[in-house]
Curated annotation (Swiss-Prot):
This is Laminin subunit alpha-4. The lineage of its organism: Eukaryota, Metazoa, Chordata, Craniata, Vertebrata. Changing P950L: In CMD1JJ; loss of integrin-binding capacity. The alpha-helical domains I and II are thought to interact with other laminin chains to form a coiled coil structure. Domain G is globular. The keyword Signal applies. It is linked to Cardiomyopathy, dilated, 1JJ: A disorder characterized by ventricular dilation and impaired systolic function, resulting in congestive heart failure and arrhythmia. Patients are at risk of premature death. Residues 256-832 are annotated as: Domain II and I. Residues 320-403, 473-528, 581-614, 662-724, 777-806 form a coiled coil.
Amino acid sequence: MALSSAWRSVLPLWLLWSAACSRAASGDDNAFPFDIEGSSAVGRQDPPETSEPRVALGRLPPAAEKCNAGFFHTLSGECVPCDCNGNSNECLDGSGYCVHCQRNTTGEHCEKCLDGYIGDSIRGAPQFCQPCPCPLPHLANFAESCYRKNGAVRCICNENYAGPNCERCAPGYYGNPLLIGSTCKKCDCSGNSDPNLIFEDCDEVTGQCRNCLRNTTGFKCERCAPGYYGDARIAKNCAVCNCGGGPCDSVTGECLEEGFEPPTGMDCPTISCDKCVWDLTDDLRLAALSIEEGKSGVLSVSSGAAAHRHVNEINATIYLLKTKLSERENQYALRKIQINNAENTMKSLLSDVEELVEKENQASRKGQLVQKESMDTINHASQLVEQAHDMRDKIQEINNKMLYYGEEHELSPKEISEKLVLAQKMLEEIRSRQPFFTQRELVDEEADEAYELLSQAESWQRLHNETRTLFPVVLEQLDDYNAKLSDLQEALDQALNYVRDAEDMNRATAARQRDHEKQQERVREQMEVVNMSLSTSADSLTTPRLTLSELDDIIKNASGIYAEIDGAKSELQVKLSNLSNLSHDLVQEAIDHAQDLQQEANELSRKLHSSDMNGLVQKALDASNVYENIVNYVSEANETAEFALNTTDRIYDAVSGIDTQIIYHKDESENLLNQARELQAKAESSSDEAVADTSRRVGGALARKSALKTRLSDAVKQLQAAERGDAQQRLGQSRLITEEANRTTMEVQQATAPMANNLTNWSQNLQHFDSSAYNTAVNSARDAVRNLTEVVPQLLDQLRTVEQKRPASNVSASIQRIRELIAQTRSVASKIQVSMMFDGQSAVEVHSRTSMDDLKAFTSLSLYMKPPVKRPELTETADQFILYLGSKNAKKEYMGLAIKNDNLVYVYNLGTKDVEIPLDSKPVSSWPAYFSIVKIERVGKHGKVFLTVPSLSSTAEEKFIKKGEFSGDDSLLDLDPEDTVFYVGGVPSNFKLPTSLNLPGFVGCLELATLNNDVISLYNFKHIYNMDPSTSVPCARDKLAFTQSRAASYFFDGSGYAVVRDITRRGKFGQVTRFDIEVRTPADNGLILLMVNGSMFFRLEMRNGYLHVFYDFGFSGGPVHLEDTLKKAQINDAKYHEISIIYHNDKKMILVVDRRHVKSMDNEKMKIPFTDIYIGGAPPEILQSRALRAHLPLDINFRGCMKGFQFQKKDFNLLEQTETLGVGYGCPEDSLISRRAYFNGQSFIASIQKISFFDGFEGGFNFRTLQPNGLLFYYASGSDVFSISLDNGTVIMDVKGIKVQSVDKQYNDGLSHFVISSVSPTRYELIVDKSRVGSKNPTKGKIEQTQASEKKFYFGGSPISAQYANFTGCISNAYFTRVDRDVEVEDFQRYTEKVHTSLYECPIESSPLFLLHKKGKNLSKPKASQNKKGGKSKDAPSWDPVALKLPERNTPRNSHCHLSNSPRAIEHAYQYGGTANSRQEFEHLKGDFGAKSQFSIRLRTRSSHGMIFYVSDQEENDFMTLFLAHGRLVYMFNVGHKKLKIRSQEKYNDGLWHDVIFIRERSSGRLVIDGLRVLEESLPPTEATWKIKGPIYLGGVAPGKAVKNVQINSIYSFSGCLSNLQLNGASITSASQTFSVTPCFEGPMETGTYFSTEGGYVVLDESFNIGLKFEIAFEVRPRSSSGTLVHGHSVNGEYLNVHMKNGQVIVKVNNGIRDFSTSVTPKQSLCDGRWHRITVIRDSNVVQLDVDSEVNHVVGPLNPKPIDHREPVFVGGVPESLLTPRLAPSKPFTGCIRHFVIDGHPVSFSKAALVSGAVSINSCPAA
């Protein structure tokens, strides 16, 4: 009813308003239609159908034919609707620009909000352009403008205000903007505040001055302080009173008596009025001002008729709504009473139901009435839709006519002059006409009436909206009533059903008795069957027990011969034969054809996979897993037997419960029988009148009896199937389970019997093994690896040559891919864990994967060693050589291992003499006849040798250790990679070992394990020498004897991955799907699990040590990100962590770590659509697919250990998967030690250990950095400090204030350097690399002995040291001498405090790559000085624009930035535009194209005009060009003095890619577009020569070029993307100069200026005063943490430089006196992907820096003779040649800049004097 009444009230006014709108649309008035619910109605003017006027092309219609309101005249004379977005009804003829924009809008089409307003003006409704809420929309708006950012409104405040919403006063002002009527006023401290501040310092709310200087006091520092007198405001001469400490007059200085009080009416003297009185006086003054302001505000409130009418309307509406609400409440109470009465008795229930049915009919009639009104509304809406369709058709007709009559054609000069004469005549005719005063008056009157009608309609519209808000409430109440009625009806039906069921049960009792008797008989029979089954089960259980004992015997036999499984030589032969897959043809093809490198890379990838499929390693691993399989079989048999036993026990329990159930059913049967007898007696005693009824009841009872019998039989069946009540079923199950246990036992016996037989056969066959098979395998492996070793260096040399020729071309990616595949091939060879037998004459040269730089300070090598069986006649082992790692000359710089005098001896040489460390505690002759672990280690000059002797029968191990130390100064093993060899077991005949290692070759078996953190193998060899297969049978090794290999774990080296195909073969996706895995890693980032299916994916990865889950199963809302936001579980601590991923009910993802819930996430219900899973990584083609790269930028493979991968609790052996790559067995402890740490300038690590740094201390570490300053190490004990730091590239050691510094000052070169510091009572020494510096007698006396204490020391920085900045770079291989521990390398993972430090990744840094641009705008040749400065020779290649995408290893992702520094872009495509002369210039092109040329290019644009291609001679007489005009392609060149012009018919500015070929052959031209349209023209040939001279301009031309030949609109730069420029089939890629060209980015763009990673800068068009006073403000969104932002430089050396450094903003200024600077480190990182505002203010010698809400300032020296200079300003970068020696070259800025303002004036980069490099002016990739 409310709906119908509301429509009846609103409909007449709405019809009246529609009629008014129709009059407004058809008449000559200025009214524009009213907007309903945001829709914008635009009138139309339909010309008469009888006579349609035709206007000639280019003529205007007579002035009398003026268009109606809302339309304008086009050049063709038609009336076209104004496009003002509903915010105006007037626009200018000809252009269509809107005037008189309303609703706070502006712009050519009223599409923008006015300054100070915010909203969506396109919606065309007044509520969408609202005043800026800064802080309040209307009453307190103190912003110039505002904008939205991340859903919040950000304000650009007036000068006096600050804060995101201008909610507080700026520094130097006071007030409370949040208080209505309050404003921010300037602080008035009478000039007595701190002069070093830019502004006066006062309380930001009250305005009371702080820190009054010059002996003043008071609220505004307006009077002299107590004890002083004088003029504090003007003269500022407050002097000390001469009253002997007594009071004096504050003005005259006259001494006053103690307790003096001034006369009434005078101000209180200073001595008697305390601060509280003055504060109270000031507060009262402020209160009075606030009262006056509030009074004026109240008086200004409008109390006119309109306000009263509005209030009355609101009151009337409220009263009406209250009345209707009370009516609804009364009805609701009535309904409630009726429902309560219905629940009391059944009779009242039936009457109430009838009453409710009647009321329901009434409600139905009302609903039909509402439905009828709704149908009327729908019909009315349909009429409106039809009118809208008619309007759309008319608009389309007008548009077609406009296109037909408005098509532009090129006019000859004669036609243009004729048109101008005609236009002048028309203008004169217009001027001669009389003005339209009368019409204007009529229009104004009608406009006033329309506005009045509009206001009335708006008030009715508000009433209508308020009424509509009541509809949901009313409808909700109706729904509640209907629901209650439905519930009541259901309750009645249920009650009736219960009555009928009761009657049925009473009639069926007789039949139940008979059925229960039969049931009891059946139960007795089942009991007999149960007893028989129990006896059978007891007999069956004896068989599994016997089987288990037999299996135990088999296991013992298998474990006894398990050590010989590794010697399965027949399987070894197959694996070794697969290693020769690399052919010479592949290498030659890669050298000859660089363009086919990708295809060869794919081929190598396939061969790489095939080298590990079904070969030696896999079969050897299969053999090593036999024991594990046997254990699994036995375990499964035990579980099956236990399950059978439990089932039998449950059967006993079920049988014991049968008796109870039988008794219960018997009692029930008796009760039913009694009830039946009672009913029968009642039936016999009934009267004859009830006989008929009784007969009917009996018939029904019989029918129900048969139905009940059926139901009872079903119940009996269910009873038999019950878990506790059915003995037969449980016994059957027990019988089946027992039989299954027997079958499993037999299968285990059948499976283990062949194994036992095979073990026996292998043991016998290995004694008589045919050496020919192994000879073939070893020779095949030797040839393959020899070929690989010879081919790979040649291939790498050739690839390096290609990369040097084109350092950043697209070939680099393919070259890098080949390198990666070669590394993976070597990685596979390194993981072959099989030993080699040496006979004393054989030798192996191993290929070391470890960097020689990593071996300088720290070297650790481990291997398995088994000496030969000792002959009885020998008492000790003969001297033997084991291994050598060092230089080829073998005179210095080496390490080795040998057996001397029956002792294992570790030898190392650091440049002068040998150090020998014999392990004399365990002679070699006493070693067991199986493998032992040997480990040699060196830290600096300290060396160790370890021996671990395992036990085959237990897990016990014997450990032996021996230490040694080099007595000289050297501490580095300085090896040259080109001059280093690694020999094992022996050496070739042409190599001469050093004297200490010149021994006979080793006899026995060796197997390499690790070198530093890398896994190595003898099978990754370069050469083998004298390896005789007949005597070199590898020895079997029982890995299970060693502690580190007892767990079935896998090692991922960061380059490989495991693949499990068809995981559903062992488990199914169900209601609960679960993945489990255990990981152990010190790394920060890595991929753990990945599943991919098209665009759908699931990914579990680690970022900064915390888990992230990304998944998309085809969700409509896109991918879901599950993140450990609370940081509950950090897993990169080198400990095992159990990770579980649970997917519940296809709609909830749960992350569990170490059995603790971390986080869960709900999603759209969707099943998991995957079958394959990648573990620890994935192939590059998977990681780099577009579907993953859009959401998953992290593509770092996992490095560390994994074990226990399970799907649905089913285990998978990762090494059994055929596609597993780069995964080894075991978990080497050395690979999990964090020996290195990376610091970012804001990080450090700390530990507390017992070390004495001031007494007998020695320590050392490696460091690598590009920064000249930084704190490397810090320790403090009270006032005594021990530190090592970098200062301008010099290493400085500071011990208790005494500094020792290195001689060399260039240690910030990005190379690794080793520092050793030693402190003794008489000398402090510092050694950097091999340079020693010392300070003797540091204390000039006896040094005080100090005890070692446990105090904290720091690496990489310190939170308590302010002298040095924190370190940026890598620190590794640190060690200390301790009292209680041996010298060993520090494991940073054990440190207690780690702040923003990466303990795994240590990126290799190098000097930044700068793009050298030429000075000036249009110079075509580079200057020699720039070549010298850049270090390039004359033949150095010019900048290649294709090289904008550098290889990933040279441009790593900034780990501290949220956004990638290289946004997604189309390969080899570049974006032009933004400036009028955006372009690339190409010079020195090969080949002559004077007679004939064929150019091709791809383009994409939405612009209608622009230059694409241009080349000419110097005078531009001969030229060739391709450009866009009106969206059409135009190809033009000259033939003599004539111009040949080919123009396309279609437009190609549709935003799609198009291929264009333009061909010139003397006087003929051809234009081919997309290979489909061929346009051809020709001119008569001439004998004139056609000569052009470069450069070729692409995307635009230099200023002043092409004006002679091309129309002005098409001279400016092409706006769009160009790609693949070719000349005669050859690509043109090397650009000599680039101006405002960036890669063609994909994805959304936003307004701003983008500076790409390739470097570039903008030179502003106006000079800038960098002298005494200025203010710069701008917003940035960086994609790197460092870079130049603004730079200005004068000729006399003064400069301003604003730049970022590791997230810190720094301002450096030189004012002619000296340098001074300030910096701000924001709390919120600048690299968080959001916009940040930076402001730099300078006033004389004071410079203030604002970064968001953080403020800092510096006061520099005053220049007595300052000079203002106006010099160019560089933004985003600066040429290196302009930097002074005091300014180190900085990286160019990478990211976006917008809203750049200088001294309050916005700066437009599109008007810049120069845009050089990769800079996009008007667009920026969105975050």
